[in-house]
Design a protein with these regions (language model features):
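Small beta-barrel nucleic-acid-binding modules, primarily SNase/OB-fold domains
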Residues: 1-86
Length: 86
C-alpha cells in the first residue's frame, strides 16, 4: 500500500516515499496543454487521500510504470475511460 504525495500530471504522481509512478497505458495531455487540467483533477479525485496499490511493470525515464488500484478498482482503466470522453 502507498499514499500519494502529489499528482504531477494526468498520468503521473509521486508517492509519499518519493517514487514517481506513471500509469501504464494512459497517455494524458501534458501539463499546460488543452484538457490537462481536467485530467489532473480526475486523477486527483481517484487517488488523493486514499490507499493505493502500485503494481510495477517497468521503468521509463526514471519513473515506475505501473498498474494502480484503489479499493480493488483499476485507476488506469478509469483514466483511460475519462480521456476517451474528454
Amino acid at each position: 500500500m502507498a499514499r500519494v504525495k502529489r499528482v504531477i500530471d494526468g498520468d503521473t504522481f509521486e508517492t509519499n516515499s518519493g517514487q514517481r509512478v506513471r500509469l501504464a497505458g494512459v497517455d494524458a495531455p501534458e501539463k499546460g496543454k488543452p484538457r490537462s487540467a481536467k485530467a489532473i483533477e480526475k486523477l486527483k479525485s481517484l487517488i488523493e487521500k486514499k490507499d493505493i496499490i502500485v503494481d510495477p511493470i517497468g521503468i521509463s525515464y526514471g519513473r515506475i510504470v505501473a498498474d494502480v488500484k484503489v479499493d480493488g478498482k483499476s485507476v488506469n482503466k478509469s483514466m483511460q475511460r475519462h480521456l476517451k470522453r474528454a
